[in-house]
Amino acid sequence: MRIPPAIIAIGRNYADHAAEMGTKTDERPMVFMKNPASVCRHGDTIVIPRVCREGGPQVDYEGELAFEIARDCRDVPEAEAMSVIAGYRVANDVSARWWQKTGSGGQFCRGKSFDTFCPMTDLVPAGAVQDPQDLDIETILNGQTVQKANTRLMVFPIRFLVAELSRGMTLLAGTIVLTGTPAGVGAGRTPPLYLKDGDTVEVKIAKVGHLVNRVREE
């Protein structure tokens, strides 16, 4: 898979996910970055690195809809936002929770950026997805559904995200934007449900694709 120039991710973009993590949705989008080198493809193995042994079990799944920027753009009006989207992908924002919260001083980037921590499907052209704000999304772990929602439940819709992210900041062609995950992540459960060696995690999004990855511990 081609390495994108940037991966921008949105946190707390589904109210039910914010609630399960003990937080609230924000008045403005919560924005963080993932290392572009974290990308991998459908069918590749998610490898939990040895460094994730620090902090105990922690590697989590987050099924998400992603979109790709078609051309360099800046200060895009919300009314024109959809014109700069090349297409959509199914993504899994794999997250090492201890590194996300404690191991890196409270900054999300490192815990989200280990190699293979951003599996994605191939691009589906924007014209093939009539309404990206009405897509069923489902995450399945070892045959059991763990997340199920619809993209219409996003707090900040895609049009707004494009306009907001491009304010004063150039989005380069090929930039990937992950739009957030709904409730059901492993960290929000009692007891927590984290990925482990031998697991299979799937993310399905209607009209966009089906992402399947096995998990291996390094």
Question: What residue spans do the PLM features occupy?
Answer:
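Short helix/loop capping segments that flank catalytic or ligand/cofactor-binding pockets
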Residues: 18-19, 42, 76-78, 98-100
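Active-site-proximal alpha-helical scaffold in enzymes
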Residues: 16, 68-71
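Extended, compositionally biased flexible segments
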Residues: 1-64
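Residues embedded in well-ordered beta-strands
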Residues: 64-68, 138
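N-terminal accessory regions of nucleic-acid-interacting proteins
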Residues: 74-88
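Short helix-to-loop capping/linker segments positioned immediately adjacent to catalytic or ligand/cofactor-binding
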Residues: 54-57, 73-78, 124-128
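Catalytic-pocket segment enriched in acidic/His residues
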Residues: 17, 23-25, 49, 97-218
